[in-house]
Every structure is written in structure tokens, then in C-alpha cells.
């Protein structure tokens, strides 16, 4: 059996590298999809910490702070036609 030419060896090596790069790109794309939902996590954790602190203060006997109530569509008056 004859030894493959140098050009064939280079082509095979390039194809191997290309396959590895494609696999790495797929892993990076998958990782990016998992990381994007974490972008707003810091703000969410800060808001949660504030709420937990407020609850702890209330349970500890502190004065209840004025907290704006969220809009509740069930409490709105409905017009009858």
C-alpha cells in the first residue's frame, strides 16, 4: 500500500480540524443559549433580597412600609353595556 501524498495528509488534517471547530462552535452556541437567560439575574436577585428584607422587618415587629399595590384586573370596575 502506498503512503498518502503530503497534500492528502494536509487535506485530512484540515478536515479533522474543521470537524473539531464545528463541534466547538456547537458547544459555544449551546452555552450561549444557557447564559443569556442569566443576564437579568443580578437585578432579580436584588429585588428578591429587598422583598425578603422587608418581610423580615415586618416579622421582626418593624413598622409596615407603604408598598404600592400592583394593578389587579379582577379588582377594576367593569362597565356594563
Swiss-Prot record:
Pfam families: NPV_P10. Signal peptide: none annotated. The keyword DNA damage does not apply. It comes from the Viruses. Residues 62-81 are annotated as: Disordered. GO terms for cellular component: viral occlusion body. Keywords: Late protein, Viral occlusion body. InterPro entries: NPV_P10. The keyword Signal does not apply. Disulfide bonds: none annotated. Belongs to the baculoviridae p10 family. Seems to be involved in the morphogenesis of the polyhedra. Forms extensive fibrillar structures in both nucleus and cytoplasm. It is involved in the liberation of polyhedra from infected-insect cell. This is Protein p10. It comes from Choristoneura fumiferana nuclear polyhedrosis virus.
